[in-house]
Design a protein with these regions (language model features):
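Bacterial N-terminal signal peptides that target proteins for export
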Residues: 1-12
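Bacterial Sec-dependent N-terminal signal peptides
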Residues: 17-35
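Residue-level signal for the start and early helices of compact helical domains
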Residues: 12-15, 115
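A compositional/structural signature for long, glycine/proline-rich flexible linkers
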Residues: 30-485
Length: 485
């Protein structure tokens, strides 16, 4: 990857996470009722901080890949929306209210996709912070906020590498402090007021908290999201790391309300001390522990029965069983080895199949089957997506809410069938249930007939641990490629 160009940092658009859904609608304000935003800004300025607005917006990860802004599409979770924090509004645009920017979506879209060069992320000094004053999403199966090292500077090699590794556990709907879950208590975390302070420094965090209190915001809705300065090399210039911050959501109860939330243009505040301060860094955050000791192993015999039933049903065509393995290592492992993990989050697991191609013959298709990890209790939701190998572009997918019950036609009368699933990927599905049609385009929004592809799997957030399940407690999802003999 090319080195960062410090001279244009303020105008580079840097987004943590993004999705393969439509581009921005007209902006709408996201107001937080329990406090006064203008008073908060004034209080921050009176506390010897300078402020800079940063857009918090939805974009299309595959479109970024197509535009040459990313080297690949980062294994986007097909059908799941993401939002991200930008580096900043360019310095030549003076603005105090992001919604006062005329034609904001169009201008941001132009900056995001139209500027030359690869996206680089943005840099923070050790005493700076990013502050989000926001509404959480409307009701959905899952949401989270997460910070990442985008480019990591490795001293031994004297270069940056694109790693996209998380530096802290996600702040998710089971852990976030909001007006509906004050101080992290159980309650309703959806469509609630919240504040997130992203910083490495205790002193900066305390001053921001005091400013929020003076503006009428309750301490019960304030979340401190620690940047571990022992891991993230903070500062500005070519020998420092770049970071991004993003927001994941999945399976809205009301799709229209969810889409409005995703499309809304809101703002984060970059907070910078006006004068030097004595640094007081937070220690590295403790990570939530994966696993409960309870496994899915007792479902192994039923899973084998399902395998045999699938092979028998499609015995008129050739079958090739593909291996499933861990796709992405955890970020704390990857960053030590300089590995790219495409925005890996500890709230899920990442599995993938071997590569294959998928033509358009009616006898050529992919059958995916396994344990429904949501039904087994090991995940809040699970899903699988179809990816191009070259671009890691997720072009089609299916969720556990959609494939529930798919195994019962193969195992009639088996009481364990409800814990299993079967789905199909093909170029044409007609009216088949639990079948996903795989497009060939346009561009990277499809995968060509002869292009190498794979199936990627996720299982998000075990309810009892509030983090992703442990790999060794799951039975891996399986893939069979069928085609004419």
């Amino acid at each position: 990857m090319p080195r960062l160009l410090p001279a244009i940092l303020s105008s580079i658009i840097s987004v943590a996470l993004i999705s393969a859904i439509a581009s921005c609608a007209a902006p709408s304000k996201t107001k937080v009722s329990s406090g006064d935003m203008e008073t908060f800004r004034a209080s921050l300025e009176n506390s010897d901080f300078t402020l800079k607005l940063a857009p918090f917006i939805h974009v299309d990860l595959i479109k970024l890949y197509e535009a040459g802004k990313l080297a690949n599409a980062a294994g986007n979770n097909a059908g799941a929306p993401y939002k991200g924090v930008f580096g900043a509004i360019p310095e030549n645009i003076e603005i105090k209210d992001i919604n006062a920017l005329s034609n904001a979506p169009e201008k941001i879209d132009s900056l995001l996709y139209g500027t030359p060069g690869l996206m680089q992320g943005w840099q923070l000094n050790p005493d700076e912070a990013i502050v989000l004053v926001a509404k959480t999403p409307p009701e959905c199966a899952y949401f989270s906020y997460c910070g990442f090292i985008f480019y990591k500077y490795y001293e031994q090699e004297k270069q940056r590498k694109w790693v996209w590794t998380s530096f802290n556990d996600p702040l998710n709907n089971l852990t976030i402090k909001t007006s509906g879950t004050p101080n992290g208590a159980k309650g309703n975390p959806f469509n609630q007021d919240t504040i997130i302070i992203v910083t490495a420094d205790k002193g900066t965090e305390q001053r921001i908290r005091s400013a929020a209190a003076s503006a009428g915001y309750s301490a019960d809705i304030i979340n401190t999201y620690v940047i571990p300065s022992s891991m993230v090399k903070m500062g500005t210039g070519p020998e420092f790391d770049t970071i991004v911050f993003g927001h994941r959501m999945a399976l809205f109860a009301d799709e229209k309300a969810g889409q409005e939330y995703v499309n809304a243009v809101s703002a984060a505040i970059r907070v910078t001390p006006k004068s030097p301060v004595k640094l007081d860094p937070f220690p590295a955050p403790e990570l939530r522990v994966r696993g409960t000791g309870k496994t899915e192993v007792d479902l192994q015999p039923a899973l084998e029965d399902l395998r045999q039933a699938i092979l028998a049903k499609h015995s008129n065509v050739s079958a090739k069983e593909l291996e499933t393995s861990v796709w992405l290592p955890e970020s704390y492992d990857a960053v030590q080895r300089g590995l790219y993990v495409a925005g890996e989050s500890r709230d899920t697991i990442y599995l993938r199949s071997d590569t294959f191609t998928l033509g358009d013959d009616t006898n050529e298709f992919i059958i995916v089957y396994g344990v429904n990890h949501a039904a087994s209790g090991k995940a809040t939701y699970a899903n699988c997506s179809f990816y191009g190998e070259a671009g890691w572009n997720g072009v089609a997918g299916i969720y556990s809410t959609e494939y529930t019950g798919g195994a019962e036609q193969y195992l009639p009368g088996n009481p364990l069938a409800k814990y299993l699933y079967v789905c199909k990927f093909a170029r044409s599905c007609d009216s088949e249930k639990t079948c996903v049609a795989v497009p060939t385009g346009p561009k990277a929004h499809g995968v060509g007939l002869d292009e190498p592809a794979f199936i990627g799997f996720r299982a998000y957030m075990e309810p009892s641990t509030k983090v992703g399940p442990c790999y060794t407690e799951l039975l891996y999802d399986r893939v069979i490629k069928f085609n004419s003999r």
